[in-house]
Amino acid sequence: MKIYLVGGAVRDALLGLPVKDKDWVVVGATPEEMLNAGYQQVGRDFPVFLHPKTREEYALARTERKAGLGYTGFTCYAAPDVTLEQDLLRRDLTINALAQDDEGHIIDAYGGKRDLQNRLLRHVSPAFSEDPLRVLRVARFAARYAHLSFRIADETLALMTAMTAAGELEHLTPERVWKETENALTTRNPQVFFQVLRDCGALKVLFPEIDALFGVPAPAKWHPEIDTGIHTLMTLSMAAMLSPEVDVRFATLCHDLGKGLTPKEFWPRHHGHGPAGVKLVEGICQRLRVPNDIRDLAKLVAEFHDLIHTFPILKPATIVKLFDNIDAWRKPQRVEQIALTSEADVRGRTGFEACDYSQGRLLREAWEIAKAVPTKDVVEAGFKGPEIREELTKRRVQAVADWKEKRCPQPKD
């Protein structure tokens, strides 16, 4: 029995990155030997065991053979005669097909170290094409390591494009698509994930609402980058700098979906694109089974982001109604989230990346003023039932009006 550290732990250590999870491969052992050594079996489809002390995963070396459609249609063979090289051959990328023995020696059967040095994401073998999920995984790795200047090998991108054209991605379940997307949204450069999907044709298959934005122009005065698809990826990049939250990043990604519905004769203007985009957000989220809290924020951002941009001239009643519409009284975090998505929208434009977004500050300040109005005073004043809500709203509007008169004085006619 020989045990090797494999995959991501070896890769990240060689890159000088923190190692989070460790996975191990066991060569020359049977399930019975593992159980007798105190390991706990957790895998049904193939033998995976938990170490009795560290609880890290130890998998018996195995080979896989395509036996059906999609990413689950594989027949697994695990036995003592399976070699380490055979096990590594089934992995997706060469940089993930590295192993390390107990003396620290690196086993590199497929050029993974060279590709790490060259910052290249390259598939191990033609068997890559048997698993459509790998298209999304490679896009995610491209996003994860974009700050290290990694790129996808031409032959790997060509294979991903061929897999997409062959309809392989249609076998992916919504849950797996969302899981990969969610993981990609947590990376430092999530926009790269969607750019790679577009490069191989997968964006049109998995996110047609986003793909439809490319080639749609916006007024050059406000959008020097002109193309709405490019703007969308720029805003996502900016959102990633402003917030680590998947909710904020996904909402930013979806904020302009309505522009894809504008008839060409109205280009480059997109009147009413916010409310129009809400249904598209609902469509994506229903299709991919996106969690409700993420969906709800994305819908609100699509509907109200343009309103936030005009915040200095909004009437106090409109501001309080906005807080009602986003349910800020019960979910106060939404104020900050919407401030950040709106800022990402403004700064996600060519030449505007470093601009100040005063509307966000005003939104936050107005919220502090409105929420400081005590409900207790209204109740103690004798208001009952629906009257409480009405009076509370009046007092909030007045408080915001008093603040706004000092903070945002408007020129007199």
Curated annotation (Swiss-Prot):
Q: Which UniProt keywords apply?
A: ATP-binding, Hydrolase, Magnesium, Metal-binding, Multifunctional enzyme, Nickel, Nucleotide-binding, Nucleotidyltransferase, RNA repair, RNA-binding, Transferase, tRNA processing
Give binding positions for CTP: 8, 11, 91, 137, 140
Q: Which GO terms describe its molecular function?
A: ATP binding; CCA tRNA nucleotidyltransferase activity; cyclic-nucleotide phosphodiesterase activity; magnesium ion binding; phosphatase activity; tRNA binding
Q: How is the cofactor bound?
A: Magnesium is required for nucleotidyltransferase activity. Nickel for phosphatase activity.
Cofactor(s) this protein cannot do without: Mg(2+); Ni(2+)
Q: Which residues bind Mg(2+)?
A: 21, 23
Instruction: From the UniProt record, give one GO term of the biological process aspect.
Output: RNA repair
Q: Which CDD domains match?
A: HDc (cd00077), NT_ClassII-CCAase (cd05398)
Record field: catalytic activity:
a tRNA precursor + 2 CTP + ATP = a tRNA with a 3' CCA end + 3 diphosphate; a tRNA with a 3' CCA end + 2 CTP + ATP = a tRNA with a 3' CCACCA end + 3 diphosphate
| Binding of ATP, residues | 8, 11, 91, 137, 140
SMART domains assigned: HDc
Q: What's the EC number here?
A: 2.7.7.72, 3.1.3.-, 3.1.4.-
User: What Gene3D superfamilies is this protein classified in?
Assistant: Beta Polymerase, domain 2 (3.30.460.10), cca-adding enzyme, domain 2 (1.10.3090.10)
InterPro entries attached to this UniProt entry: CCA_bact, HD/PDEase_dom, HD_domain, NT_sf, PolA_pol_head_dom, PolyA_RNA-bd, tRNA_CCA-adding_enzyme
Q: What else is known?
A: A single active site specifically recognizes both ATP and CTP and is responsible for their addition.
Quoted from the entry, the domain comment is: Comprises two domains: an N-terminal domain containing the nucleotidyltransferase activity and a C-terminal HD domain associated with both phosphodiesterase and phosphatase activities.
Q: How does it assemble?
A: Monomer. Can also form homodimers and oligomers.
What family classification does the UniProt entry report for this protein? Belongs to the tRNA nucleotidyltransferase/poly(A) polymerase family. Bacterial CCA-adding enzyme type 1 subfamily.
Q: What does this gene product do? A: Catalyzes the addition and repair of the essential 3'-terminal CCA sequence in tRNAs without using a nucleic acid template. Adds these three nucleotides in the order of C, C, and A to the tRNA nucleotide-73, using CTP and ATP as substrates and producing inorganic pyrophosphate. tRNA 3'-terminal CCA addition is required both for tRNA processing and repair. Also involved in tRNA surveillance by mediating tandem CCA addition to generate a CCACCA at the 3' terminus of unstable tRNAs. While stable tRNAs receive only 3'-terminal CCA, unstable tRNAs are marked with CCACCA and rapidly degraded.
Which NCBIfam families does the annotation name? Answer: PRK10885.1
Protein name stated in the entry: Multifunctional CCA protein
Origin organism lineage: Bacteria, Pseudomonadati, Pseudomonadota, Gammaproteobacteria, Enterobacterales
